[in-house]
Amino acid sequence: MSAGTAADKHFSNSFFAAPLTEADPEIAEAVAKELGRQQHEIELIASENIVSRAVLEAQGSVLTNKYAEGYPGRRYYGGCQFVDIAEDLAIERAKRLFDCGFANVQPNSGSQANQGVFLALMQPGDTFLGLDLAAGGHLTHGAPPNVSGKWFKPVSYTVRREDQRIDMEQVAQLAQEHKPKVIIAGGSGYPRHWDFAKFREIADSVGAYFMVDMAHFAGLVAAGVHPSPFPHAHVATTTTHKTLRGPRGGMILTNDEALAKKFNSAIFPGLQGGPLMHVIAGKAVAFGEALKPEFKIYARQVVENARALADTLISGGYDITSGGTDNHLMLVDLQRKGLTGKAAEAALSRAHITCNKNGVPFDTQKPTITSGIRLGTPAGTSRGFGVAEFKQIGGFIVEVLDGLAAKGEAGDSAVEADVKTRVHALTDRFPIYG
């Protein structure tokens, strides 16, 4: 065997056969540590979930090798006949899940899905209406640093101070005053249902498009445990992770064929080139899972668990914005306890409970500090936690935060260590990827 042939064989064997632990031990170690974190800590970040092994397998498949600019049957590259199958399945399953006529599954994120809608429906400088970030909106709904706040003219509505519910009178007043091109319902920190019919009525009164960003509650909509944006919305955007429990990505849904064509053009070639076909395959798998009866049981449990967690925290003396939750998330207002979200997040992290600091309506703290934390139940529910477990978790949180309030920013190390031990005992009862 010549030296060249031997080298070629060695390259082929190692390149295509070497596992990650051999090919890149540093990355392998980081992955292993992250797996351990997910297995042994309680995940309460509302935007996170735990996907099935089937979704992981699809996303880590050879479809990552394929470029496929365009749409199924209309690609700019050859060899797309099999990735077309994956995308067609994702599209058809999405349409069944949300009972709509058109779906674009190519956006790489919820943010890009929103950008696609903006590109299709507005011109730079046009006005749109969205929920204020401080009241539970999202960066892509007009925050000044975001492209939505730089290229367009956002006008923000907020919640009522007395009950932290959407102020629909203000929405109507602002719509009449500013005549927006688009009105958005949806956000990242609003725990109540949205009055989609009233939003559409307001949009129609000023000739605006009504857009729903259901990134956080799409899985609940798919399962029928949350009101659907359709038939009220002209367009709905979503992520495909969060409550939908798929890979990280985005999607645009509509019943309007003319708008669907605009959204398709906005995503490709407007914003993206070749779509991530391995991620689209993962989306198809997740949508297939969401069409099964088991997913409805899961989604109902997500909501029941969230209510149980909120009730436990209220019983423990903590304030929940709007007094509770209708979906998978809640905001804990820590102002009455004299705590910041930053300190609470750190204390809970030391006890192996993961959440995120979050602003609360009319917050006076900086966004990097905040007066609250956001909690969600999707990931815990995916691993099997029920109402009893979330009541227990609520008790853990009360213990840690009470210790923080008593001891100061360093927290109560003895309480945190004790809670961490009980957290591990709980997660050991509900293993993932074992």
From Swiss-Prot:
Record-level GO BP terms: glycine biosynthetic process from serine; tetrahydrofolate interconversion
EC number: 2.1.2.1
Alphabetical list of InterPro entries matching this protein: PyrdxlP-dep_Trfase (IPR015424), PyrdxlP-dep_Trfase_major (IPR015421), PyrdxlP-dep_Trfase_small (IPR015422), Ser_HO-MeTrfase (IPR001085), Ser_HO-MeTrfase-like (IPR049943), Ser_HO-MeTrfase_PLP_BS (IPR019798), SHMT-like_dom (IPR039429)
Cofactor: pyridoxal 5'-phosphate
SUBUNIT field: Homodimer.
Key words, A-Z: Amino-acid biosynthesis, Cytoplasm, One-carbon metabolism, Pyridoxal phosphate, Transferase
Modified residues (N6-(pyridoxal phosphate)lysine): K242
Pfam families: SHMT (PF00464)
CDD domains referenced in this protein's UniProt entry, alphabetically: SHMT (cd00378)
Identification of the protein by name: Serine hydroxymethyltransferase
Any GO CC annotation of this UniProt entry: cytosol
Key word DNA repair present: no
Signal sequence annotation: none
Site (Plays an important role in substrate specificity): H241
Binding residue positions for (6S)-5,6,7,8-tetrahydrofolate: L133, G137, H138, L139
Reaction catalysis annotation: (6R)-5,10-methylene-5,6,7,8-tetrahydrofolate + glycine + H2O = (6S)-5,6,7,8-tetrahydrofolate + L-serine
Pathway noted in the entry: One-carbon metabolism; tetrahydrofolate interconversion; Amino-acid biosynthesis; glycine biosynthesis; glycine from L-serine: step 1/1
The UniProt record lists the keyword Glycoprotein: no
Cell compartment(s), UniProt: Cytoplasm
